[in-house]
């Protein structure tokens, strides 16, 4: 028999995604084979597409929900046919034995297994430690939203947000919106959000933000101080990142003295930093990325429970869906917020 092939979308190095036949993903000892059902296009996927100048060998895509096709013995009682959200980056590739894994920080594993490709292909392989069973009450759309929700769960757990805190969120794209939901769920007294596009403003309100302002300079800072009696937000989450640095400084300005600025967006350019204000006001700047396990509970588990509670209509942020053959249209729409897009999903 010949090599088994599947369909996958690969960037040709010029920003164009071409669907082609590629070998099935490599299997490692104890890894599971999962059929991808739905995947989200992340902002990082868009940024990497604009920066990549060589053709991809493996498909990307890390916001994944799928069905287990094959799985060996595991301690999570997972069996073929189970519907799962897949933690692609950390737990799904972790050795589980290094100092980081033993402390629940699988994303920092120093012996991670080789990457075998992501959710823009028909099949993926990951270790059972990165598979989280979806309840029957969650559909595939929610399943593919577990990953971005877990990012915000991790950010606000890591920052040790307290009930009654005033939380600011800079940006109302996918991660900003999930940060609003998590902050409200964790008991924030008020959540102040900034948003640039009409669909983001509407979504931020639906997700529970108490105050939503435009992205114009000064409006967010003023709103955070107004909401806190002139003190500033206890925690500000910077969720935008990208090829600019203004939102980093804006987040610091909106944070109260001895408060926390959670740097979640990830800037892709060199930055000139004037940190004298942050130093004088003893603001703690916390860099946060992805997800982990704390007190024996993974951020994915909390994200699944939060989505299953249906307290906030987070599923509504998925504005567009395309099948794999039309993934290029998906990237075009996801890149153009004037199209009305927030989250774009790819279905198999």
Task: Describe the function of each predicted region.
Residues 138-217, 222:
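Mid-domain Rossmann-like dinucleotide-binding core that forms the NAD(H)/NADP(H) cofactor-binding site
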Residues 202, 206-284:
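Glycine-rich cofactor phosphate-binding loops and adjacent beta1-alpha1 units
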Residues 2-5, 214, 226, 230, ...:
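C-terminal capping/lid region of NAD(P)-dependent oxidoreductase domains
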Residues 90-170:
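NAD(P)H dinucleotide-binding glycine-rich loop of Rossmann-like/cofactor-binding domains
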Residues 25-39, 52-97, 135-137:
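Glycine-rich beta-strand-centered segment in the early N-terminal region that forms part
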């Amino acid at each position: 028999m010949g090599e088994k092939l599947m369909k996958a979308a690969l960037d040709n190095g010029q920003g164009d995604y071409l669907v082609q036949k590629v070998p099935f993903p490599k299997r490692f000892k104890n890894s599971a084979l999962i059929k991808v059902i739905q995947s989200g296009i992340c902002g990082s996927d868009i940024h990497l597409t604009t920066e990549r100048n060589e053709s991809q060998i493996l498909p990307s895509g890390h916001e994944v929900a799928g069905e287990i096709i094959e799985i060996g013995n595991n301690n999570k009682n997972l069996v073929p046919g189970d519907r799962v959200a897949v933690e692609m980056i950390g737990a799904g590739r972790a050795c589980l034995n290094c100092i980081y894994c033993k402390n629940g920080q699988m994303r920092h594993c120093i012996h991670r297994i080789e990457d075998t490709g992501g959710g823009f292909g028909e099949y993926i392989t990951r270790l059972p430690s990165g598979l989280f069973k979806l309840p029957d009450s969650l559909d595939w759309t929610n399943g593919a939203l577990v990953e971005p929700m877990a990012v915000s769960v991790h950010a606000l757990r890591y920052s040790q947000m307290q009930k009654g805190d005033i939380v600011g969120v800079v940006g109302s794209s996918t991660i900003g919106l999930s940060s609003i939901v998590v902050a409200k769920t964790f008991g924030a007294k008020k959540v102040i959000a900034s948003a640039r596009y009409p669909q983001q403003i509407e979504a931020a309100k639906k997700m529970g933000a108490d105050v939503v302002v435009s992205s114009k300079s000064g409006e967010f800072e003023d709103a955070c101080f107004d909401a806190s009696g002139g003190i500033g937000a206890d925690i500000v989450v910077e969720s935008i990142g990208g090829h600019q640095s203004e939102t980093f400084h804006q987040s610091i300005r909106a944070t109260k003295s001895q408060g926390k600025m959670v740097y979640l967006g990830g800037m892709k350019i060199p930055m000139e930093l004037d940190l004298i204000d942050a130093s004088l006001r003893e603001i703690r700047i916390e860099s946060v990325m992805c997800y982990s396990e704390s007190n024996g509970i993974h951020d994915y588990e909390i994200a699944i429970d939060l989505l299953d509670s249906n307290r906030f209509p987070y599923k509504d942020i998925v504005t567009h869906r395309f099948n794999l053959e039309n993934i290029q249209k998906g990237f075009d729409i996801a890149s153009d917020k004037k199209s009305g897009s927030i989250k774009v999903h790819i279905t198999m």
